[in-house]
Amino acid sequence: DPGPQMVRMWVDRSHFKPYPATVQRLLPVEIGELNRLYQLGFASWLPATAIADGVYYGMRVNGRLVAAAGTHVISHAARLAVVGNVLTHMDYRGRGFATAVTGAVTAELLRSCDQVVLNVRADNPPAINAYRHLGYSEHARFEERLIHRLGPPWADLTAPLRRVNALRKLLLERRADLVLGDDRGGRRDAGAHP
């Protein structure tokens, strides 16, 4: 199924432009509040481990979480991270909140990663401009698509293994027949002599 056109953007330490703002590092105990915010735009829930294992920052107005950004993936081995889950409550858009929380997440990630990337819908110029303000630049454009699986998830991988195991079993049986002295099609007769 066709999906939205997306823009992959990236930044490294030399191009990153910090955005001064008062933001807060989110803690796993705040997952309920974060998920309530995300329900306004994503309709998905994150487990508390997403915050514990990732980097999430939020912005509050009168104690209420109104903007947040976090991570999809952090690879310390590849020194690469992917920012995601950026959302600002509809009533607070256009005030730089998404830039602030994305900037805080990016700054922390660039302490241990050489590059940080993110994906954004091509039809979202305010978000693209916010990321450019932080030093992100366009790397590629692509189309996101939904893929429908036609069979069990591992069928393509397990079918060859099943064939190899069946062949192995057949070869072991044939080998046993030869060891017992029966080469007449796999029948064993322990009392027969050549």
Residue ranges with predicted function:
Residues W45-Y56, R60-L87:
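A conserved beta-strand-loop-helix scaffold within acyl/acetyltransferase catalytic domains
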Residues V117-I128, E144-D156:
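Conserved beta-strand-loop-alpha-helix junction that forms the acyl-donor binding cleft
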Residues T22-E33:
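A short beta-loop-alpha structural element at the N-terminal edge
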Residues L109-N119:
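Conserved GNAT acetyl-CoA-binding A-motif
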Residues T88, G94-L110, I128-H133:
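Conserved acetyl-CoA-binding loop-helix of GNAT-fold acetyltransferases
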Residues D1, T99, A122-A140:
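Conserved active-site alpha-helix within GNAT-family acetyltransferase domains
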Residues A190-A192:
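Short linear motifs in low-complexity or flexible loops
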Residues D1-P20:
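Acyl-donor-binding surface of acyltransferase catalytic domains
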